[in-house]
Amino acid sequence: MCLEPISLVVFGSLVFFFGLVKYFKRGERQRTRGILQPEYKDKYYYSKEKGEEMGEVANVNEIPVKIRNHKYPAKEHNLRVKDLLLNRNPKLSKISTAFFIAGEELEGNKYCDTNKDFRQNRYFYHLSGVDIPASAILFNCSTDKLTLFLPNIDEEDVIWSGMPLSLDEAMRVFDIDEALYISDLGKKFKELQDFAIFTTDLDNVHDENIARSLIPSDPNFFYAMDETRAIKDWYEIESIRKACQISDKSHLAVMSALPIELNELQIQAEFEYHATRQGGRSLGYDPICCSGPACGTLHYVKNSEDIKGKHSILIDAGAEWRQYTSDITRCFPTSGKFTAEHREVYETVLDMQNQAMERIKPGAKWDDLHALTHKVLIKHFLSMGIFKKEFSEDEIFKRRASCAFYPHGLGHMLGLDVHDVGGNPNYDDPDPMFRYLRIRRPLKENMVITNEPGCYFNQFLIKEFLEKHPERLEVVDMSVLKRYMYVGGVRIEDDILVTKDGYENLTGITSDPDEIEKIVQKGLKKPRSGFHVIV
């Protein structure tokens, strides 16, 4: 068919136009169809070139729908602290009150021109939502006015780091009433000469006149801040949920990648890599990545042993998202199949967690749930033969023999810190069963906690908790115990939101042992080309 030149131009223009329409529609779908959105959480596409299932590429800037276009609610947090502080100390209602917090500053490494990793003061962040070093906030309880003080512009720093956030930009980004520079602090404090001004500490307060006008370390002020942080608002809950979603996929990646995980450090690397690719710029704590007998160390820090010849892996790792952290632990067999002893221990811990989970609701006493998990452990150990059958469950419980295998608490508060504030622990408790329990209060709605029972076979724990206490050692069949030592330990940890009538498990990665075996086995069948192709 022969077309005139003018017709070719028109035809080409139409093709180009419809091509653009298709392109932008496709782009819109990509923008609204991120892998991290709940409705696409389990969606995958098939790569014909590689002949394998692959996840969609994550959008590192994806923001949860519920908090999209919302500022971090700093004003609301300040108002809650104010109400709790005045209720705690009614005398303050008769005088003018304010609180001031100086944020963390960049700290240099000795003898070089690099800085330590910056981590914002959590109290400061909770009352500001600001992650800028050397900033400060002032909240006037009389006017409910929140003022942010940004560091003065350093021309030399601009040469290397670019222009910092301007005052106008700060007003648009943060939930504040006023933005000033640090150089304006003195003038602002002159307006508050008759105020009682509370602060956390004087560590980053460099003006002596301002320091003299502050009241540091007041227990009522800390109570008000801790209680406010303990009960999460909607924005905080969605932030933790997002952190959990990032960690879910990172744990799945670790379970699926044993062919390229020859050392514990490579387990850590796999988790951090996938967390970073999803926008988790840091972890909430140093990850625990251990194998074999090392799994019996509660907070293992080496992450350096080869995995060859080990039967078990334990990874305790949680990504942060916008300062809020997750905290998830999973265990899996290196062969893709639990050994008989590993499976028994795993199902014991899973039963401990499930029994506690069923009872999580407002008003539940954490002490009672913790004690319950010890009783579940004792029941299983009697069945396994580790505890001698001539002793009753109650007798073993009273002797605290289970503490040799489960020395830590059932869980802790979770939020801006991995071991968040507000749990009211009592580390001086003479009872070994409760000494390390980090929550010693009834649960309340909108608390976020971890549910993380464990079972460990650790020579040091056996020596400290059994051999030094004959009444405990008496109930243990050491010949049976020896068969389980190679397992090291098992801990299963989920992040739980206490709801009005019960709980919501924010953790999505499976803890079902059959499903875990399938995930590991599928990963073991992948060829080398199915993973990172360079190293």
Swiss-Prot record:
Keyword Ubl conjugation carried by entry: yes
Pfam families in UniProt: AMP_N, Peptidase_M24
EC number(s) per entry: 3.4.-.-
Organism for this UniProt entry: Saccharomyces cerevisiae (strain ATCC 204508 / S288c)
InterPro entries recorded: Aminopep_P_N, Creatin/AminoP/Spt16_N, Creatinase/aminopeptidase-like, Pept_M24, Peptidase_M24B_aminopep-P_CS, X-Pro_dipept-like
Upper taxonomic lineage: Eukaryota, Fungi, Dikarya, Ascomycota, Saccharomycotina
Stored PROSITE patterns: PROLINE_PEPTIDASE (PS00491)
Residue spans crossing the bilayer: 8-24
Protein name: Uncharacterized peptidase YFR006W
Chain positions of cross-link Glycyl lysine isopeptide (Lys-Gly) (interchain with G-Cter in ubiquitin): 50
Binding note for cofactor: Binds 2 manganese ions per subunit.
Membrane topology category: Single-pass membrane protein
Keywords: Hydrolase, Isopeptide bond, Manganese, Membrane, Metal-binding, Transmembrane, Transmembrane helix, Ubl conjugation
